[in-house]
Amino acid sequence: MGERVVILGVGLHPFGRHPEKSVGELARVAALGALKDAGVEFKDIQAGFCGHVVQGVGAGLRTFGEVGLTGIPITNVELACASSSRAAMLAADAISGGIYDLAMVIGVEKMERVLLSGVGGAEEIGRAHV
């Protein structure tokens, strides 16, 4: 079994309607809070994992770029409601396996009125009452 993995810090942007803010701006508030909580700096982060649903191709790169973390490997995770938890699991696996010592996981979504219409299979899931 690999090394023990812990969550050093957490951050959260207050929930609510924020039409004036980009996804990256929302993520930055949470990321800065997590760094402060953990007592680490941006330069300490070796990899980023971004969980989202409908932010599109390259969402992790854009989000981490707006947060201020560039030049590190970024993994995008698009797995519907399990996106962010899977991103955390992937980060933990990478740390446990000795690939990284410190990674940041960002779970981000900006809900729109037409959100589920853009998710492939949403109608089928609804019909199946899942």
Each model region followed by its residue ranges:
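Conserved "HGTGT" condensation-loop signature of ketosynthase/thiolase-family condensing enzymes
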Residues: M1-I74, D93-G97, V108-R127
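Active-site-proximal alpha-helical scaffold in enzymes
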Residues: L79-E109
